[in-house]
Amino acid sequence: QAQEVYDKVAYCKAPRIGRGVRLDRKIRMQIWDVFDEYQNIMNEKLQRDVETAMYECRKILENKKLTGQYTSIIVDEGQDLSPSAYRLLRALAGEEHENDIFIVGDSHQRIYRNKAILSKCGINVRGRSSYLRINYRTTEEIRKFAFGLLNGVSFDDLDEDYDNGKGCQSLTHGDKPEIKEFATLEEELDYLVSRIHELEASGVEQKNICIVARTHKLLDNYIAGLQRAGIKSFEIKANKTDDRSFDGVRIATMHRVKGL
């Protein structure tokens, strides 16, 4: 779908660079049968997944000559948009013109598998892009720790080049991140409870403490553990704002705190 391949012949010829697993023609034919049946079911239900919806919207704009609906389009968190999304935005903006599309993105913050090469989506940024090197949100200690984890990993610049992250710096400072290791979940929960009490004793309110986990299962374990210790918690969910009138430790998945 990222390559907007919607027929069997094109699918068998579509490149799979970077996908990891090689598929010969026989396997591709078998996979196509599954995808074709999926498309038939979606058509019967008059439903579309996001990628197909964006593709069909763009085709409607192009076929009815409705492109160029907006003078300027601004994109934030551009690293998370798919090729289909960028092609749709290109159609909405129309032919290339001054200040047509402004994109802000950071591939280091990409948490979805969407990866678009802007030049292949009709968006020319070569010689027109700028790097923002000053971080006003994260402390220098956290920034160094994060880039240390990413050492040796290559990141794209949202086009056909790479961003090595060199030259970035933060203007604020704070404590160095600590790494704690635990043999069991119970040990981890005991530490969390004691750490929360330490922070409270130093004057930090519970609602200014946030526990972040990779999965919802881990969140459920943390919520149950805090409840047993008599500590209130407030889970930050999708489409639900953080109610600051409610006391309690904030708890969320890594997806929910993205951008904070």
Feature locations, PLM:
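P-loop NTPase catalytic cores that bind/hydrolyze ATP
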Residues: 1-4, 32, 36
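Conserved helicase motor core of SF1/SF2 NTP-dependent helicases
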Residues: 24-27, 33-47, 59-260
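Short coil/turn segments at secondary-structure boundaries
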Residues: 7-14, 45-55
